[in-house]
Amino acid sequence: MSLTEGAHTKWGVLKQKLGPQDPDQIEGNLENADPELCIRLLQIPSVVNYSGLKKRLESSDDEWMCQFLELSGLDLLLEALDRLSGRGVARIADALLQLTCINCVRTLMNSHKGIEYIVNNEGYVRKLSQALDTSNVMVKKQVFELLAALCIYSPEGHALCLDALEHYKVVKNQQYRFSVITNELSSSDNVPYMVTLLSVINAIIFGTEELRNRVQLRNEFIGLQLLDLLTKLRDLEDEDLLIQALVFEEAKSEDEEELLKIYGGINMNNHQEVFSTLFNKVSCSPLSVQLLSILQGLLQLDQSHPTSPLLWEALEVLVNRAVLLADDCQNNNVEEVMDRLVTSKKLSSKEKRKTDKCTNKVNKSIQTDKPKEESCEGKTVKKDPVSSGIPADSLQLLDALLAPPTKEDSPACITPLHTHLSGELTCSSVLPSPPSPLVPNADERISSSSSPLPPPPPPLPGTELSPPPPGMVALSLPPPPPPLPGMGGMLPPPPPPLPGMGGMLPTPPPPPLPGMGGMLPPPPPPLPGMGGMLPPPPPPLPGMGGMLPPPPPPLPGMGGMLPPPPPLPGMGGMLPPPPPPLPGMGGMPPPPPPMPGMGTFTDEVVVARVDYSLGYLPKAFLKVNKPTLKMKKLNWQKIPPNVIKDSHSMWASASSIEDTVEPNYSSIEQLFCLPQAAVKESAVPVKKPPKEITFLDSKKNLNLNIFLKQFKCPNKEVIELIEKGDRSRFDIEILKQFLKLLPEKHEVENLKSYQEDKAKLSNADQFYLLLLGVPCYQLRIECMLICEEINLMIDMIRPRAKVVSSACDDIISSHRLPLFCQLILKVGNFLNYGSHTGNANGFKISTLLKLTETRANQTRITLLHHILEEIEHNHTDLLQLPTDLENVSTVAGINIENMYTETSGNLKKLRDLQNKISTAATDVKEQYEKSIQDCMDTLKELEEQLTDISQKKVKLADYLCEDPTKLSLEETFSTMKAFRELFLKAKKDNKDRKEQAVKAEKRKQQIADEETKRQKGENGKIIRKGAAKLEEGCIIDDLLADIKKGFQLRKTAKTKTKADACPKTLSSETNRTDIQHVGKRPEVPPVHPQRKIIILKRQ
């Protein structure tokens, strides 16, 4: 086949794959397929296979669906969805494949068999939640819809949904379980997707029948700034969004009202009110000490710390358990109460910690993943049930906080570890030799134990044995008669061989270490898993010496002696040397296994050095001439010596030739040497010019030079500016800095006593000499500074004083404020009728800020909202009250006390300067006397303005019925500003609520019109689409339709009180019956044995 024909063939195949296909070919190929064929096709993910499967699922009966589920069809779909989500959506084909796959899952859940199978088998919802880790918004929308439907379907589905969100939080390392929902809601601009997210929030809240659980779930969302998000979402003015937001707010207000009834009018969602109630409850009792200690401890918890959420969740669990035990621990002490608080989780937590230690060691050695269920003593550690509702990590942290401390260095466990999957995996092994110690962990060092030697032969000094850690490359002893290197005079003359070694060994004798023979007491045999996983060899027969086959590699790391050099090859136990051999040297055919290193154990890797035995001449090293200079390098790649030795190469043959070519090393050294650094001749020292003379320290000299450079003129001009009192080139900061740099007394004396050439002085010293020639230079600079400061202060304070005075007049002269306060007074007396706060003649002005704290029975309506509605209908002019307070709001934030302080302080400075000027030189008097007097006159006028403000403050206090000595103008203006903002916000809220009500009414009318247009049955009743869908088995679609409309959620929210009063089982059965419209729950397909194996492996 030519190249052109091959290209045409490839393009043709690609065209067939990418070109349009027949719809029957895409979706009709699985119309009558059996479950086995569908399972096979699912193993090849494609749009064609998923589309055909979706159509087959829609037309399947219960028997076909059961077979499909038993054959792990749902497992294949969820696994494929998880893998596709991990790819991202870099290609359109992957996005389409994800959508078709999730549509198959939705179609399967639409059937009774499918959704019941998912609800009754844990793990599927977790797998489904992992598909949220994708950038495909359509796929995430479908997954969230399925989670919302599961929450409403049954309590079991609600628990599985919460467990899946908790699992997703752990997998993605998020801080809160609902963060995935709120993060998507805040970052998305897709309105349908935001509607789905809000519906998930409502479904999670309405999925539980317990009031406290609903409030807790809702508060979790509120803690993630959901209320702020709802305010932004209302601005989008989408009908579906408004429905979900309205459902959330209505249910919130109804639950809050129910809580008020239960807790006697205490708003349990208000932190301050709950704390005040608790404080008043225990303030007059000894329990207040414990409350204070608890609060002090909570205050120490860092909110930004990563473990802070876990600590707060654990404390919440502990408090809930304490509430349950409050009536049943009268005769217990503190220790018994603590044991009861954690008794349900304490044992499992200990077992879990012990199991984790063991399995960690096993997993490190065998390099496998940690099983889900394992125990250290043959018992299975099971996870908490999903229905508990308490995060597992919180319980673990709670147990860790309350459990007694344990020693870190204690042995984890010494008994064999049995698991369900691998039979026998040992965390540690019991050694067969009685005197050998137990080793808890192969990775840990074991303390050495001294072993006394028997009398014959004499003991080796410093030979202390301990079971060594693995990983050391052992070194063998050279044959005698030479002494062991590194031992020096420590060894006595070699003793004669001990026949049999029987009298020196205990019974039963453990196997000897190679190279040690009978001179040392035997150490324990190698641990299983440390020496190739081989069992220890049997002990040698007496008198056999080195005739036994070699034992397995010995235990490395025998501490107490220095490691000997490597052995000479060929010195096996079968060819003993002429002198008597060391006992135990035999049994090792060449090359012998290395013996344990006898030095102190370190973590370094010891590499054995290659040496040669007697009678074997090693290859002589090549003789290389050493250059006398540093040479340039030749970049080559060396061939290993063993390669040259073992092969018939050119290098091996060239080395045997006698006639060799010698290079001219001297010429090479001259041509290829590195350049040498030239020796510098000693330079003749040059005389440095004499330095400038200065009487200032280096720091002050530098600062003064920097100060003078900013003028960019000679020093004489700066002095002339000071003499003339010209402030055009001086500002306040420069004058303050100038005062700090004035010469001190000793500097003045040194400069005046200097009689030599002035030109030799530094620039700073010369400036000081010029400055000293100006009479009263410091007083002149102080006068310039005070004049600048007073002019600036007057420009700032005078307009502020004017505005404050005007704000006082606005409050007193406003005719709308008294009318509004009279209206509030009447409403307040009506609400407080019969109480000690009723029948009031007036109220503090700060009460205006509390109008929003009194909430109505309807959502988002406070007392201020209602009063503004009344004003809008009956007193329209009062709506202009914010215009009367506009100037007052601008004054808020001005520090009036600071104005008094600055004015009085500057007046005092001016009087002091006047006294100094009166005794100064004549030219200074003429120059600054008038300026200082003008400043004093201006400050006196400002002081009169402040006095007028003080008088108006007294009038305002009398107008507001406040104490003049305690009234603060700053607080009064801030209160008016905050009230004005609340007034405007409530006015806007009323307007928005009316517009939303009009839209909601139009939508209701539109739905009612659609209901009337529907087809009617024989009895004249409307045939509802929901009932028809339920008969066809479309459970998910029906639930999502009700969630989208808000009808089911509103009905659930309105009947919460009745549902809480009913038994839990009754309400659950009623909910299930309403959803399924059948009197009996469908049968759940049994889990196939193969399916159980798959689940076990995945866990």
From Swiss-Prot:
Domain GBD/FH3 residues, every copy: 1-330
Disordered: annotated segments: 348-391, 432-509, 1000-1019, 1064-1085
Pfam (any one): Drf_FH3
Gene3D superfamilies documented for this protein: Formin, FH2 domain (1.20.58.2220), Formin, FH3 diaphanous domain (1.10.238.150), Leucine-rich Repeat Variant (1.25.10.10)
UniProt GO BP: actin cytoskeleton organization
Domain (FH1) ranges: 426-569
Composition-biased stretches (Pro residues): 452-499
The keyword Coiled coil appears for this protein: yes
Alphabetized GO MF terms: actin binding; small GTPase binding
PROSITE patterns referenced in this protein's UniProt entry, alphabetically: FH2, GBD_FH3, WH2
Name of this chain's protein: Inverted formin-2
Organism per entry: Xenopus laevis
